[in-house]
């Protein structure tokens, strides 16, 4: 099984969309294996967005991501990185297709509700930033046999 990091950004938290977003992931059959509410510090922001720190838009990104709590979630599932990114839609909410999270709930490029890892490497790096090894819960869902075939 593959794991990915999902961050419900300050706009998602402030707009009280946490439950709606989590419901969509759960309805898709994705498995929550860790979750916490936290305030991103400027230091954590710089670590998370290290590739953007020198870019002109970074100061506003840091200001936004540190402005209110976020919900960090570790999701597990088959091809979960691709599946989650498909569910999110285009980065810019104005360009995201209806039916995607951003298409349904966002109309902004920066305030686009959710961050998700874009590769296995970034997923591992980001999961390590937000969670300690002992914070992951490995458990079986009784519904798993009804979500996909054994050979998938």
From Swiss-Prot:
Q: What is the name of this protein?
A: Nucleoside diphosphate kinase
Q: Which organism is this protein's natural source? A: Rhodopirellula baltica (strain DSM 10527 / NCIMB 13988 / SH1)
Q: Which family does it belong to?
A: Belongs to the NDK family.
GO cellular component term, pick one: cytoplasm
Q: Which Gene3D superfamilies match?
A: Nucleoside diphosphate kinase-like domain
Cofactor(s) recorded for this entry are: Mg(2+)
The enzyme's first-digit EC class, named in words, is transferase
Provide any one GO MF term from the record. Answer: ATP binding
What biological process terms from GO does the record include?
Answer: CTP biosynthetic process; GTP biosynthetic process; purine nucleotide metabolic process; pyrimidine nucleotide metabolic process; UTP biosynthetic process
Q: Report the CDD domains cross-referenced here.
A: NDPk_I
Keyword terms, alphabetized:
ATP-binding, Cytoplasm, Kinase, Magnesium, Metal-binding, Nucleotide metabolism, Nucleotide-binding, Phosphoprotein, Transferase
Query: Where does this protein reside within or beyond the cell?
Result: Cytoplasm
Name the catalytic site residues: 115 (pros-phosphohistidine intermediate)
Signal sequence extent: none
Q: Which InterPro entries match?
A: NDK-like_dom, NDK-like_dom_sf, Nucleoside_diP_kinase, Nucleoside_diP_kinase_AS
Alphabetical list of SMART domains matching this protein? NDK
In terms of one coarse class, where is the protein primarily found?
Answer: cytoplasm
């Amino acid at each position: 099984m593959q794991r990915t990091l999902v961050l419900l950004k300050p706009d998602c938290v402030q707009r009280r969309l946490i439950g709606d977003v989590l419901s969509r992931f759960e309805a898709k059959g994705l498995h929550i294996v860790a979750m916490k509410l936290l305030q991103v510090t400027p230091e954590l922001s710089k670590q998370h967005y290290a590739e953007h720190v020198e870019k002109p838009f970074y100061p506003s990104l840091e200001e936004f991501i540190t402005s209110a709590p976020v919900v960090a979630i570790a999701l597990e599932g088959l091809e979960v990185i691709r599946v989650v990114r498909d569910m999110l839609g285009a980065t810019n909410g104005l360009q995201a297709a209806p039916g995607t999270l951003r298409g349904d709930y966002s109309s902004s490029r920066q305030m686009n509700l959710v961050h998700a890892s874009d590769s296995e490497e970034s997923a591992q790096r980001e999961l390590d930033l937000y969670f300690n090894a002992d914070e992951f819960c490995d458990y079986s869902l009784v519904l798993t046999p009804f979500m996909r075939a054994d050979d998938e």
